[in-house]
Amino acid sequence: MEDLIVAIVVGAFSSAISIFVVRKLDRAKFEVFIEQAKAKAKVIEHEAEMALKDAQLKAKIECDREFKSAKREYEAMLLKIERKERELNEHLESELKAIKLEKEQIVEKNRKITTLKDGLEEQKKTYEEKTLEAIKILENACGLTQSEAKELMLKKVKEDSRAEISSIFRKRYKIAEQNTKNEINNMLSQAVTRYAGEFAAERLINNIPLNDEETKGKIIGKEGRNIKALEMLLGVDIIIDDTPNTITVSSFNLYRRAVATKTIRELLEDGRIQPARIEEIYKKVKSEFDKNIQKEGEDVVMELGIKTMHPELIKLVGRLRYRASYGQNALAHTLEVAHLSGLLASQMGGDAILARRAGLLHDIGKALTHEAPGSHVDLGAEICKRYDECDTVINAIYAHHGHEEPINVESAAVCAADALSAARPGARREVLESFLKRVEEVENISTSKLGVLNAYAINAGREVRVIVKAELVNDDEAVLLATEIAKEIEEKVQYPGEIKVNVIRETRAESYAR
């Protein structure tokens, strides 16, 4: 349509130009040309009208075709929707019919169940009545009530079952006991054979050789002044006249005896033996021993492969070197228990390092028993709790004396190792231990009194020397104190013969000249 209009415009424009040209060229022919142009214009206009009508007709035909196509699609879609709706309605009606039928069936089943339930209740009632009648007949026949008959039957069944269970249990128990014994014996034998420790029984005396008899006179001093100072300061018995060229140092306390022996040896080497020098050497030796105790503990901990331990506990381990139980050195016993505990725990699938730690600390309370009241078990548990030792160590301390049950393999290993070490033939001497306990008890009674500084049992426990503080106890009170201590010893300690209580009160005055 647009092309047609453009053609018409172009033609008209061309005609106008032609007319203009014709006018200019030939006025005479202008009219003819005008007529021709009009004729052409009519032809063109007619053609344009025909083309326009043709285009309109084509457009109408195309619109009708598209409309009919859209109408057909719409009608097809409408039919499809109607069909789906009809199918859904039919399905819904079918479902509703099924639900209605199922509901009717449920109602029918409920009715039948109710009928059966009523019938069962009736039968149950009849059964109970018949049962009661039968029970009454049986009770009349056997002379027992229902409860009595039930008790009799249960008793019989229980007795039969108990006898059978007991028989099975005894058999199984014997087998388990034998197997356990065999396994334990095997473990213990392997652990004992794998550990070869050193052992030496502790003595009560140390002998110091002398070069000549003149040295004895130096030790005794003028009017026995030096030997009295030594015995009072060191807390030991010093015996000079029994053996030629020998000084015997006697004490149940290993630490005091070792310090005394070292002090006397250094005095002999120094040659200057008099009370002031004795006290000076004693302080020096005691300081060295305290340092050695710490090193001894560190060496033991390192030997056992224990990485960390509180310094105070290490110091107490070192002090066990100077403790004895039934003649057995406490540190040697502790080391033996620690090694055996580790071996036993490893064989039982436990932690060998933890077992060795618990074994090392199981008798740690013995390092404190001279200074603090109470059993070594309670003291050891308390000190280990204070320094944050684990529950296994605490349990092992209590368990090895039966105060608690072992809570794990490591604690059980410590208990077994302690029993092995103590029960080994020749490991302990009962007579010596009873003597040591008696002497310790005498010292503890003495030191428990107010104003007492130190107490030393000497002369094989037949005498106790009590050193008191001069500012707290006067001379009259010292006499009363000696009587009180002697009376308490009589009441609490069993001993042969008699024990001499010697209370010593000393006042010192010091001044310096500069």
From Swiss-Prot:
GO terms for molecular function: RNA binding; RNA endonuclease activity. Its EC number is 3.1.-.-. One of its GO terms (cellular component) is plasma membrane. It is found in: Cell membrane. Pfam families: HD, KH_1, RNase_Y_N. It is a single-pass membrane protein. Keywords: Cell membrane, Endonuclease, Hydrolase, Membrane, Nuclease, RNA-binding, Transmembrane, Transmembrane helix. It is an enzyme of class 3 (hydrolase). Belongs to the RNase Y family. This is Ribonuclease Y. It comes from Aliarcobacter butzleri (strain RM4018) (Arcobacter butzleri). The lineage of its organism: Bacteria, Pseudomonadati, Campylobacterota, Epsilonproteobacteria, Campylobacterales. The gene is rny.
